[in-house]
Amino acid sequence: MRTIIFGAGSDLGVNIDGASLGPQQLMNDLTTFYQGESIMLNQDNSIIKSRNLSDRRKNEYEIEKFNSNLYKNIIEKVKEEYFPIVVGGDSSVSIASTFAEAKANIDIGIIWIDSNPAYDTFETTQTGNIHDLSLAAVTGYKCNDLKYYHEGKIVQPSHAVLIGARSMSEQ
């Protein structure tokens, strides 16, 4: 099976700019030793991110648009028998990559290594940043609004492992 690396340059899911730059730099550095196929997807730089502290759905439309494009690209490459590796900016891109894999494979699991468990919902998020909802969305926990483009399987919660999480919300 061939490998394809997707650079998913987006920081729309967080309030601090810069996470979108990492995938581009990594893709540039990979050219010295990786000869396989790669695709770089970047967020639209004309987007003005929400800085409204009371906005509990920051950049939801823009993230949906970016993730829908990433999702479609991954599904297309999986059909061509590629194994996708997605290098993201913020963790909201994991929603698209996980749903694409769930659609392509019968049963998947996820190992989430992060101090942020990303298991908030639109009701429990304190920041409104969608990266805080990523793991909840892919395991089907109260975030169905984030699967606009995906009809199908989710990651079963019993197949999700958290490593390094500092704490979980009581909700």
Where are these regions (language model features)?
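Conserved alpha-helical scaffold segments that buttress catalytic/binding sites
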Residues: 2-171
